């Protein structure tokens, strides 16, 4: 047994996100249809307290179009972040979520994933943004809009 001491050190750092807008209306329609067809397969038992599909949706219509986009972008941002190291991106899971008013996602991380992403098919007026609790008093909320694809590090 090792005597392990935990120390919380004050750290000033940035949370880096990578964002781009996708203009894929036909893909979006397919994804929306599949999310509606699947309904809530997780029964609100995950961190997402809303309608959530299965975990591995990559073969479903629309999702199968999003996957190569996500893999390509993750490779590009990895080369930027990790100084041109050769990267072989892979997808562990991809799912869909549909929120109603008052439904939330509990703060969580996606460790051990290097990257996580969220893709907004639509963004109702006054919808809350994507929020990072790690930013505390600095805010940390990203305003969402239809077609916005946001990558962030999996440990946050």
What are the roles of these predicted feature ranges?
Residues 88-156:
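Catalytic core of non-heme Fe(II) oxygenases with the double-stranded beta-helix
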